[in-house]
């Protein structure tokens, strides 16, 4: 299938609107991607004509909704090449998925004196849950340091592992720098030391194929809203043997087998024992539509288009005076930058006046900001619906801001 950005853009209603009297150039998909009409329509259709509470319902609507929900679980398992759909837990997003692992697997397997390894480039969602776990049990949090070019100091990694290392929690792709970490060698090293590996895939799954079996990671988590799906839904993959051993971390309906005031409660089997309460069924349906949409386009086609666009953007940005870029030359999805000594908020505000949407701030990565000794950065993210013309508008906008502000 030939990739056509014009055809893709036609599927996204919001891209036809104007901001401040100018066509919207949406360069903030790494924060949250826009939704194609196919996703919007699928979720709306479910609420119009198919909504019902899932599980245990004897009536037709409930049975159909349950079947649709479980079909999306199967669809998502194929999307990341899991061995079984029952290795996938529906969560609210990447943050909840990581917290689930920290509170279920972590509480059961990490003890005083143990250690967990993360990196200096992690999103707060892959830092704070491990800090909280370590504080609870008296474990140590170890950190892989950064290089100035935005890659990790991988030569230090072997020195961080020891017989007390229980987990390596690492991002697949940095949400600020676009760095893609060499997961295969990192996972192999962790397993050689008897440690498990959790991968934060929030910034990876929309850019290229992910094969959890080939990676051999123990946990992989991602959100739907960055993958052109709805908010409030994500996927946590856990190797089956691990998932079966993990206790639930939330109690309520749907996750029990029996409840007795005198005998206590027994849990249903995984993955359903991790899905307490009424699920976000509409979001799950929308996620299924997003997976179908991206799969039909072909992730290899998307990756090729986006990489060409990234190379073009990096080359064009070289023409902007006093522009500092952060991250390696080879990157996925995002370009973080600052313009002279101007605060990122000021630059972002000017760009918004030009109809260009970028993200500004610390990007939930304060340790990374501290490493580069800046309070904030601007971040432009490139998605499959962005164009060379939008890149040109960004470059022209930055040049204009430089002339105005000096």
UniProtKB/Swiss-Prot annotation:
GO MF term list: cysteine desulfurase activity; pyridoxal phosphate binding; selenocysteine lyase activity
Catalytic activity: (sulfur carrier)-H + L-cysteine = (sulfur carrier)-SH + L-alanine; L-selenocysteine + AH2 = hydrogenselenide + L-alanine + A + H(+)
Pathway stated in the Swiss-Prot or TrEMBL entry: Cofactor biosynthesis; iron-sulfur cluster biosynthesis
GO terms, biological process: cysteine metabolic process
Disulfide pairings: none
PANTHER family per record: CYSTEINE DESULFURASE
Record protein name field: Cysteine desulfurase
Phylogenetic lineage: Bacteria, Pseudomonadati, Pseudomonadota, Gammaproteobacteria, Enterobacterales
């Amino acid at each position: 299938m030939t990739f056509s950005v014009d055809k893709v853009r036609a599927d996204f209603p919001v891209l036809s609107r104007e901001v401040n009297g100018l066509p919207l150039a949406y360069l903030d998909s790494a924060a949250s991607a826009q939704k194609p009409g196919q996703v919007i329509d699928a979720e709306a259709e479910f609420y119009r004509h198919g909504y019902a509470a899932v599980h245990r319902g004897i009536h037709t609507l409930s049975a159909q909704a349950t079947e649709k929900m479980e079909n999306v679980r199967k669809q998502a398992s194929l999307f990341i090449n899991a061995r079984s759909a029952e290795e996938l837990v529906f969560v609210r997003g990447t943050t909840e998925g990581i917290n689930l692992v920290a509170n279920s697997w972590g509480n059961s397997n990490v003890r005083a004196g143990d250690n967990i390894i993360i990196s200096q480039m992690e999103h707060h969602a892959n830092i704070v849950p491990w800090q909280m776990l370590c504080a609870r049990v008296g474990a140590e949090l170890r950190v892989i340091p950064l290089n100035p070019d935005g890659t990790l100091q991988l030569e230090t990694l072997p020195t961080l592992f020891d017989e007390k290392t229980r987990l390596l929690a690492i991002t697949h792709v940095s949400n600020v720098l676009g760095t893609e970490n060499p997961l295969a060698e990192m996972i192999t090293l962790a397993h050689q030391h008897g440690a498990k590996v959790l991968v934060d895939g929030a910034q990876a799954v929309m850019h290229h194929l992910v094969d959890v079996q080939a990676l051999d990671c123990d946990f992989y988590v991602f959100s739907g809203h960055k993958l052109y799906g709805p908010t409030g839904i994500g996927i946590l993959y856990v190797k089956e043997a691990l998932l079966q051993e993990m206790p639930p971390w939330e109690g309520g309906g749907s996750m029990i087998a029996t409840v007795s005031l005198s005998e206590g409660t027994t849990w249903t089997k995984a993955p359903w024992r991790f899905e307490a309460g009424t699920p976000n069924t509409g979001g799950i349906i929308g996620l299924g539509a997003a997976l179908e949409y991206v799969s039909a386009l072909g992730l290899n086609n998307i990756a090729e288009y986006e990489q060409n666009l990234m190379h073009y953007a990096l080359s064009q940005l070289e023409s902007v005076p006093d522009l500092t870029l952060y991250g390696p030359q080879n990157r996925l999805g995002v370009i973080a930058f600052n313009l002279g000594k101007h605060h990122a908020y000021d630059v972002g505000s000017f760009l918004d006046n030009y109809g260009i949407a970028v993200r500004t701030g610390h990007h939930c990565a304060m340790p990374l900001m501290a490493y580069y000794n800046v309070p904030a950065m601007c971040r432009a993210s490139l998605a499959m619906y962005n164009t060379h013309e939008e890149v040109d508008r960004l470059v022209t906008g930055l040049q204009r801001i430089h002339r105005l502000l000096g």
